[in-house]
Amino acid sequence: AFIMIKSDFHVHTSFSTDSDTPAREQIEALINKGITEICITDHHDIGYTAMEKADVNTSESTNTNIESRPFRINPFAYYEAILGLIPEYSDRARISIGVELGLRTDYHHSIEDFAEVCAWDFIIGSTHVVNGLDPYYPQYWEGKSKQQGIMEYYDATLANIRKLDCFDVYGHIDYIVRYAPNQRENYSILDYKDIIDEILKLLIQNGKGIECNTADRKSVV
């Protein structure tokens, strides 16, 4: 008989710029949902520059305090904080300490060094920045078609995984679609089949996992 183990290995807490939920509260919420394998993977994006966000679909400004903080963590404080929670939940869940690294070829030495600074259990490698801009912001899409913006993202993804090997699993390969104008409207994966195939083949060749990220189900699917 098979035993299904519910797990979540992409979890952000208040150590991440995009979360205000303390680690303990996040762990409790996951356990209450029946998840017993948990890896905290807060963001660390070297070279990331936050800016005011205007919703790409409404053009309304959504500038908040979150937008003014960089996506950086103090690795030692973060590691010790999560490590301290592991014994507390040992009879209810197995908790691991990870990180989500923003991959960039122009900071590859610093990113590789950070990957070695602590004994991480798990590292997600993700592309959040293309030519200095995050597709989350409408500034990324200015002066280019939706197809061009998406292709530039996949080009950057391929360059990142060719250059960097310091991660276990590649995160949210369709991140770009989540923030594209009108999201998945008029989007077909077949339009980008060649480069996506190249990305997937290289990840497999390098022994990397490929994340199944369902974050956009609540708003898109």
Residue ranges with predicted function:
Residues 2-105, 114, 179, 186-190:
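An N-terminally biased module of ancient metal coordination in phosphate/nucleic-acid-related enzymes
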Residues 5-8, 37, 94-98, 121-124, ...:
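Structural preference for beta-strand elements that scaffold enzyme active sites
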Residues 20, 45, 118, 122-203, ...:
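Divalent metal-binding pocket/active-site signature
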Residues 25-28, 77-84, 109-113, 118, ...:
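Alpha-helical scaffolding segments of alpha/beta enzyme cores, especially the outer helices
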Residues 51-52, 110, 136-137:
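Short aromatic-enriched loop/helix-cap "lid" or pocket-rim segments at secondary-structure transitions
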Residues 104-108, 151:
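Short gly/ser/thr-rich secondary-structure transition/capping motifs
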Residues 214-216:
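Basic, nucleic-acid-binding surfaces and adjacent catalytic neighborhoods in DNA/RNA-processing proteins
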Residues 220:
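Conserved small/polar residues in nucleotide/adenosyl-binding loops
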